[in-house]
């Protein structure tokens, strides 16, 4: 795959950088949540970190044939203060992607007829909507000094779709069967 338009390529690199940082940040915050006796919130962070990894990999793969050094600039929350603040940082990051970043990237890819970029931006946007809700639910529980009450978290390995529904049969975003999902 190769991207013909510089703007879409820049957006893919930016999204790759942002998703890569979210992946690492969520792994760190997941460990901290577990160490603070919030194992389910920790597991949620780790599951969503896997989803962010999938998004980064999808963006990377669209640019796979465009090999060269590039500076990647992406906004990110840094630091770690406490569970409530970490969850707020996660919520803010997801909302930024939902309301600002991915809608612009997606429309640009459509306009420039970059089908693979359009697909990967769509996958990420749809998953981020779920992530924001799950992080909000986790924060609501943590504000009451409670761990979130969840079972397994399932992640689609193709698009990063995230669900708590153990009865789902296939991914509603990309169609992959649930038996391929990663469970956390």
UniProtKB/Swiss-Prot annotation:
| Keyword field | Electron transport, Iron, Metal-binding, NAD, Oxidoreductase, Peroxidase, Transport
Q: Does the keyword NAD apply?
A: yes
- State the conditions that upregulate or repress this gene: Various environmental stress conditions, e.g. oxidative stress (exposure to H(2)O(2)) and other stress factors such as salt, increased pH, high concentration of solvents or cold shock, do not lead to increased transcript levels of this gene. However, PubMed:15336429 shows that rbr2 is slightly up-regulated after exposure to air, but PubMed:19648241 shows it does not respond to the presence of O(2). Is not repressed by PerR.
Q: Which residues form the Rubredoxin-like domain?
A: 151-184
Which GO molecular function entries does the Swiss-Prot or TrEMBL record give?
Answer: iron ion binding; NADH peroxidase activity
Q: Which Gene3D superfamilies match?
A: 1.20.1260.10, 2.20.28.10
Q: What activates or inhibits this protein?
A: Rubredoxin (Rd) increases the NADH consumption rate by serving as an intermediary electron-transfer shuttle between NROR and Rbr2.
UniProt binding sites for Fe(3+) 2: 52, 94, 128, 131
Which cofactors go with this protein? Fe(3+)
List of residues binding Fe(3+) 1 = 19, 52, 97, 128
Q: Where does Fe(3+) 3 bind?
A: 156, 159, 171, 174
Reaction catalyzed? H2O2 + NADH + H(+) = NAD(+) + 2 H2O
Q: What does the record give as EC number?
A: 1.11.1.1
Pfam families given for it?
A: Rubrerythrin, RUBY_RBDX
Write out the function statement from the record: Functions as the terminal component of an NADH peroxidase (NADH:H(2)O(2) oxidoreductase) when using NADH:rubredoxin oxidoreductase (NROR) as the electron transport intermediary from NADH to Rbr2.
Which named protein is this? Rubrerythrin-2
- The source organism is Clostridium acetobutylicum (strain ATCC 824 / DSM 792 / JCM 1419 / IAM 19013 / LMG 5710 / NBRC 13948 / NRRL B-527 / VKM B-1787 / 2291 / W)
């Amino acid at each position: 795959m190769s991207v013909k338009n510089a703007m879409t390529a820049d957006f893919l690199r930016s999204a790759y950088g942002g998703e890569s940082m979210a992946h690492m940040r969520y792994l760190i915050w997941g460990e901290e949540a577990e160490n603070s006796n919030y194992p389910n919130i920790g597991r949620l962070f780790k599951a969503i970190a896997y989803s962010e990894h999938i998004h980064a990999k999808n963006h990377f793969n669209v640019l796979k044939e465009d090999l060269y050094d590039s500076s990647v600039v992406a906004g990110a929350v840094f630091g770690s203060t406490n569970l409530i603040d970490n969850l707020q940082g996660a919520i803010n990051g997801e909302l930024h992607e939902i309301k600002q970043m991915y809608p612009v990237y997606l429309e640009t890819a459509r306009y420039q007829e970059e089908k693979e970029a359009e697909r990967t931006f769509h996958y990420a946007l749809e998953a981020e909507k779920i992530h924001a809700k799950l992080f909000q639910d986790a924060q609501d529980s943590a504000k009451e000094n409670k761990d979130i009450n969840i079972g397994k978290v399932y992640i689609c390995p193709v698009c990063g779709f995230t669900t708590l529904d153990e009865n789902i049969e296939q991914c509603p975003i990309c169609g992959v069967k649930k038996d391929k999902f990663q469970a956390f």
